[in-house]
């Protein structure tokens, strides 16, 4: 029997945030990362920058053709408008843009917008439906609100820096500006929640207050409940996952692997794979509590086995045993990994400076309305005339 003809392909869906206009007044990381995320899913993001200097991120880290390559990621899908917000004319124009916007993103010190005549009360008189995201070091209220705060300080106050590094040593940085990015992601959640509320509950906007240290604190797991219930102050544990065993980094002849053998059945398979069935069969190691009590012995056994093998040999052996394990990737490893490419997590982006650069893809993956890179990062003021 002949099959019916295939149905024609469905037309592409509109972007999830198509029609949402965002005014981004933030700079560096926290505010702009939120704007970047909203822009990837279709929002029209208008970035207001100071004339002549622009966002300082344009000049951070490694520079190519006069601009940071980081800028090419952080500011894609945005339009740049040069305005001096310290001057009356710039403030007037900004208010006109905000009057027609859905979202305002800012990460100035509390009180800055108020000093420019752009308090929430004043802006909501202009635009009652405005969703206003305010990211700052300590929030818009409280005794610390006026203190200067960067992501690193938020990581310290939020409890993260105390847990990083080796026990008894200097607290170390995670390696990226995780405090700023966590604040941005919490802010993005707030924006999307407020937009939904506006749609289904009467059209009113609201203010979203995100403090850097609170965004970090919100992911500190059982830190406070353990202190409240037991008086336990969690300490740094190096590469290990404290209270869970075995879960650690182990040396190989050519690098490091992370092994998570902390499930009861996984632990037994792991011990068989490394030639230590005696540990896998030990009654007191059949559950996590017992394994934590002997974690140094277990880690030593795994490390002695892995240290005689390459990373790939370890991964092959543990993969065959169905034990979760992974190589510690460098940028080179990521750039050469076929899985990243298969999931469109490495994309080539043409810049306005005449060269192409590989950039991270878009997260999360939406089946019906996936994110896209519609435009490359703008030069300072590229869109001033068109927008105004």
Name what the model sees in each region.
Residues 184-206, 218-229, 271-277:
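Oxidoreductase and adenylate-handling cofactor-binding alpha/beta cores
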Residues 2-13, 286, 354-388:
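Flexible, small-/acidic-enriched active-site or ligand-binding loops
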Residues 52, 138-139, 212-217, 254-256, ...:
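Glycine-rich beta-alpha junction loops
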Residues 1-190, 194-201, 379, 383-386:
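N-terminal helix-loop segment corresponding to the beta1-alpha1 unit
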Residues 245-321, 325:
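Aromatic-enriched alpha-helical interface/lid elements that frame and gate functional surfaces
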Residues 320-374:
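A glycine-rich dinucleotide-binding beta-alpha-beta segment and adjacent secondary-structure elements
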Residues 71, 237-242, 247-248, 354-357, ...:
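Short Gly/Pro-enriched turn/cap motifs at secondary-structure boundaries
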Residues 140, 168-177, 199-216, 235-242, ...:
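Conserved Rossmann-fold dehydrogenase catalytic segment
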């Amino acid at each position: 029997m002949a099959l019916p003809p295939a149905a024609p392909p469905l037309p592409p869906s509109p972007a999830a945030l198509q029609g949402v206009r965002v005014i981004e007044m933030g700079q560096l990381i926290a505010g702009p990362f939120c704007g970047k995320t909203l822009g990837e899913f279709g929002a029209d993001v208008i970035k207001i920058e100071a004339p002549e200097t622009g966002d300082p991120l344009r000049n951070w880290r490694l520079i190519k053709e006069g601009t940071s390559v980081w800028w090419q990621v952080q500011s894609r899908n945005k339009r740049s408008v040069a305005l001096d917000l310290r001057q009356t004319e710039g403030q007037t124009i900004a208010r006109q843009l905000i009057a027609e916007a859905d979202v305002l993103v800012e990460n100035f010190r509390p009180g800055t917008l108020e000093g420019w005549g752009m308090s929430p009360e004043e802006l909501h008189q202009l635009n009652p439906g405005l969703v206003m995201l305010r990211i700052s070091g300590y929030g818009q209220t409280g005794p610390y609100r006026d203190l200067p705060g960067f992501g690193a300080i938020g990581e310290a106050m939020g409890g993260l820096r105390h847990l990083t590094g080796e026990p008894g040593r200097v607290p170390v940085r995670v390696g990226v500006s995780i405090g700023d990015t966590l604040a941005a992601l919490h802010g993005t959640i707030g924006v999307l929640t407020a937009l939904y509320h506006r749609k289904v509950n009467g059209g009113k906007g609201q203010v979203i207050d995100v403090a850097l240290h609170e965004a970090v604190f919100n992911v500190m797991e059982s830190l406070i409940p353990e202190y409240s219930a037991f008086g336990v102050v969690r300490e740094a544990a190096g590469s290990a996952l404290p209270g869970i065993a075995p879960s650690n980094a182990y040396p190989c002849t050519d690098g490091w692997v992370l092994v998570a053998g902390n499930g009861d059945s996984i632990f037994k398979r792991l011990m068989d794979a490394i030639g230590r069935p005696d540990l896998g069969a030990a009654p007191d190691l059949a559950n996590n509590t017992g394994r934590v009590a002997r974690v140094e012995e277990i880690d030593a056994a795994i490390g002695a086995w892995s240290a005689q093998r390459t990373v790939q040999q370890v991964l092959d052996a543990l993969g065959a045993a169905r034990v979760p394990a992974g190589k510690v990737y460098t940028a080179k490893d990521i750039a050469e990994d076929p899985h990243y490419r298969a999931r469109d997590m490495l994309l080539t982006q043409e810049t306005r400076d005449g060269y192409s650069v590989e950039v991270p893809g878009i997260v999360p993956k939406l089946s019906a309305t996936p994110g896209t890179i519609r435009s490359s990062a703008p030069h300072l003021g590229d869109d001033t005339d068109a927008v105004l």
